[in-house]
Swiss-Prot record:
Domain of life the protein comes from: Bacteria
UniProt source species: Rickettsia conorii (strain ATCC VR-613 / Malish 7)
The protein's name in its UniProt record: UDP-glucose 4-epimerase
The encoding gene: capD
Catalytic activity, EC: 5.1.3.2
Coiled coil regions in record: none
Alphabetized CDD domains for the sequence: UDP_invert_4-6DH_SDR_e
Length: 341
């Protein structure tokens, strides 16, 4: 599906960029691709990636999604875009909400506009469960990013740039996530700091995140949102699973929720569930293609939203301690940390 095509990954030196490039390299897909452009701000991370992967198909572009000119110029000749650049740390965005807006909203506007201007065939925008019923600045900014993508999708004519969204749950062992934090605390003999023991989070692997984006790329139509069904765990069970894996007796301390944290996350709202397609492993939420003349649609009717539940980390499959341990042991990151323990 990428034969002789040029692909751009914004924020390409991050967790997702590394995961998708690893997939392409191991599977041989990269041999079919004309070029992959890594667009990001950090020259050191780009240099590290260039040396580590050492592949002539990879081209590196220094730039910032906040700067329209830099993203527009880098996108000349691009066929497909995976937009992963974002500020994603919830507490940080709470303290610096304008920075979240500048990157996650205005930056996304720049990426989408540049893609349309350069006649890119398809853009996959990476979002988060925190965009559903958002209570924090990061989630609000990502929700607006989704709205931008859908609004622009609604205005596209057949044959123009296709814009799709993917929503992630918690991506295990991604940069800045709780699993690396717990493992570091365990290995350093420190107290494990748990915010709220009964708090639940979806558990997705980086492999799952790549699967979701590639599924959306292959099957997505204009304005679609895709969600992967994922199991969940409480934070306490996750911490205890890591203790067992690393044979740790570290003390656990409950420190209370951080700024902007929710007790549980939602991947699909009840309103979206009313129109979502169940695709076995995924939900597809089609774009609401109506215009502002609602009267002509009234006779069509719709499902009663009040009768539907949103899809949350509380009502999805809940993993017990042994199941969480089994899942964690499938992660390359955990295996590497065990070797170095």
């Amino acid at each position: 599906m990428f034969v002789d095509k040029t692909l751009m990954i914004t924020g390409g030196t991050g967790s997702f960029g590394n995961a998708v490039l690893s997939r392409f390299l191991k599977s041989g897909i990269i041999n079919d691709i004309k070029e992959i452009r890594i667009f990001s701000r950090d020259e050191k991370k780009q240099e590290d990636m260039r040396i580590a992967l050492n592949n002539p198909k990879l081209k590196f572009y220094i730039g910032d999604v906040r700067n329209y000119k830099s993203i527009d110029e880098a996108m000349h000749g691009v066929d497909y875009v995976f937009h992963a650049a974002a500020l994603k740390q919830v507490p940080t965005c709470e303290f610096y909400p304008m920075e979240a807006i500048n990157t996650n909203v205005l930056g996304a506007e720049n990426v989408l506009s540049a893609a349309i201007n350069n006649k890119v065939t398809k853009v996959i925008v990476l979002s988060t469960d925190k965009a559903v019923y958002p209570i924090n600045a990061m989630g609000l900014s990502k929700a607006l990013m989704e709205k931008l993508a859908i609004a622009k999708a609604r205005m596209r004519s057949p044959g123009e740039t296709v814009l799709c969204v993917t929503r992630y749950g918690n991506v295990m062992a991604s940069r800045g996530s709780v699993i690396p934090l717990f493992i570091n605390q365990i290995k350093q003999g420190k107290v494990l700091t748990i915010t709220e023991p009964s708090m639940t989070r979806f558990l997705m692997s980086l492999v799952d995140s790549v699967d979701l984006v590639l599924y959306a790329f292959e099957h997505g139509h204009q304005g679609d949102i895709f969600v992967q069904k994922s199991p969940a765990s409480t934070i306490e069970v996750l911490a205890k699973a890591l203790q067992d894996i690393f044979d740790s007796k570290n003390e656990i301390r409950f420190i209370g929720t951080r700024h902007g944290e929710k007790h549980y996350e939602s991947l699909v709202s009840s309103e979206e569930m009313a129109k979502a397609d169940d695709l076995r492993d995924y939900y597809r939420i089609p774009m609401d293609g109506r215009d502002l003349n609602y009267a002509k649609y009234f006779v069509e009717g719709e499902k009663k939203v009040a009768l539907l539940e949103d899809y949350t980390s509380h009502n999805t499959k809940r993993l017990n301690l042994e199941e969480v341990k089994e899942l964690l042991l499938t992660l390359d990151y955990v295996q590497e940390e065990l070797k170095n323990a």
